[in-house]
């Protein structure tokens, strides 16, 4: 079947040879409708056809255009294949060799640095053990000296006492009166022997084991191994009405307006923006981290359960009483505070996270910045009773990280 007898369409000439026919007109599909993106016959493309006014071109022209596109695409694919082949042949072997070389160098670096750290730790261990031994020897020698001194004192007192008893039992009145000066001298000699007094020289000084290097390495190890094992959450009963507590009980947000939703109770702080954790510690080693990067006014530390909760006095204010030990920040001022004593800390910038290490075995509280590996401050004291992690925030938000 051919397009003969069909109404003339756009352009001139008859359609291509036999092939698929138009289902509507039975003519060869010799034209292409760009609007409908399909082949059409001359009748469809003519004045009365359905594609009148559309973008019409001959089918062979459209086919030639597609052939040219295919050729261009094949050339691009050939170039792409060549580039990939060259990359696989030339670049990847070098990358692989460089990766092997860099991995070997990285291993050497790790070994070198850990070897240096190990050597430094061994040297520090030896130095500290020698200091401990030296302090033990010093205390032991002081005790021996005291033993000798008091043995001599006892012997002298016994001699004086024996002499005085002899005078008392063997001398008559006149002889006793004649010995008055001797009695006075012996009594004065006895009075010159003082009673024993408590002396730190007789005690082992635990400060001999304190080392900035050891403390820093120890804090890093403790935070890395223990932080996260403590499931520290805030006790909602203690939260100040000026604070909002998150659903997971780990985030405190400061509010300038006092919340009316908080029911007052004996555990709740009613003035200062404080909160206690639900967990307390009486012994052992504990560590936790707090995200403080969003706040310029906060306090983090530990407090005794005896910390008062009511009123605006210093007895309820963290760091201003005998029941709380805290690291605090106000703008660019950093301090460690306890019982109204505030120790300034010379920090150039505020930590993003604050690590807290509580070692109740040796009665030590330590604050640490994980990002820089810096011990911000350490406090040694005999802590009374169970201790609770404690928090205060007067700007934005702080969160228990883990």
UniProtKB/Swiss-Prot annotation:
PROSITE patterns: B302_SPRY
Domain B30.2/SPRY span(s) in chain numbering: 212-402
An example molecular function term from Gene Ontology annotations: zinc ion binding
Keywords: Calcium, Calcium transport, Cytoplasm, Ion transport, Membrane, Metal-binding, Transport, Zinc, Zinc-finger
ZnF start-end (B box-type): 17-65
Record flagged with keyword Zinc-finger: yes
One cellular component term from this protein's GO annotations in UniProt: cytoplasm
Subcellular location: Cytoplasm; Membrane
A Pfam family the protein falls into: PRY
GO biological process, one term: calcium ion transport
Disordered: annotated segments: 1-20
Membrane-related topology note: Peripheral membrane protein
Subunit structure, interactors included: Interacts with TRPV5 and TRPV6. Interacts with YWHAZ/14-3-3 protein zeta.
Function (record text): May regulate epithelial calcium transport by inhibiting TRPV5 activity.
Protein name listed in UniProt: B box and SPRY domain-containing protein
Organism this protein belongs to: Homo sapiens (Human)
